[in-house]
Amino acid sequence: MKLGIITIERDAVVNDLIKSCEKYEVDYKVITPSNIVAGFNLDFKLKYYKSFLDELDCCFVRNLGWDSFFRFDVLKYLNHYIPVINPPDGIDRASNKFLTSVFLELNNLPQPKTVVTESINEAIVWIDKFEEAVLKPIFGCGGEGIVRVKKELPISTKLKILNEFKEKYNTFYIQEFIKPVRNEHRDIRAFVVDDEVVAAMYRIGGENWKNNVSQGGRVEKCEITEEIEKLALKAKNALGLFYAGVDLIESEDGLKVLEVNSTPSWIGLSKVSEVNIADKLLEKIIQYVKS
């Protein structure tokens, strides 16, 4: 099999996948998206130096970089000729928190109470209704830009927070803050590949309430319960993804979906997983391409 790996940098995830490619004797090519050339009414469709991308068996998308509509459109074009993992439409839905909430809602999957608005007045109304809320940028990952706001804050403080947030991100994605069911802040990352939840971990908050490993959180192994398996698979499928990192949070009335990641890292999860995640992912990709 010939696999393209599209990424702006050769990070730990890419290196891990390359090791698996070498183990399984998969012919791979690391592709820098800025050097792809699209052709029309010519003798090629998509070219990378002297290689033709539509002659690959599959392309794996790791990191396109930010704010590149052209690169994303290239994926859509490429997907007409070969499988792209993850599918561009799925990446589009998962990278946009508003669209993620839309598809979770359409598929009747539990998520925290959420409102999305550009109005500062409406934002204040809903922060007060939730009593404690989390503001998130619609686009973003790793916990960056996320702000926790409480009802009891002075109105001047709330306005300052909201004005600064709006200046940066324009749109407010506001979720009720889910109070921890135990004594510590934690959530669950379930790693789903095709029809299988291959591993899961607890991400436990560091010095603050954010559980992201990139924000100082630590990881512990999480047993894959029937509830985790069922919800993670449904969330992945709702967004039209081949594989995903599904973030779940425990609440008094069961698990809720926080986020679905379409280009998730598995490096932190590998520390507590008995499964070699890169191997499992590549095995599933090979099966998919052959089917």
From Swiss-Prot:
Quaternary structure (record): Homodimer.
Family: Belongs to the RimK family. MptN subfamily.
Catalytic activity: 5,6,7,8-tetrahydromethanopterin + L-glutamate + ATP = 5,6,7,8-tetrahydrosarcinapterin + ADP + phosphate + H(+)
MF (Gene Ontology): ATP binding; GTP binding; ligase activity, forming carbon-nitrogen bonds; metal ion binding
Official protein name in the record: Tetrahydromethanopterin:alpha-L-glutamate ligase
Function: Catalyzes the ATP or GTP-dependent addition of one L-glutamate molecule to tetrahydromethanopterin, producing tetrahydrosarcinapterin.
GO terms under biological process: protein modification process
Co-factor(s): Mg(2+); Mn(2+)
EC number: 6.3.2.33
Keyword Oxidoreductase included in the entry's annotation: no
Residues annotated as transmembrane: none
Keywords in alphabetical order: ATP-binding, GTP-binding, Ligase, Magnesium, Manganese, Metal-binding, Nucleotide-binding
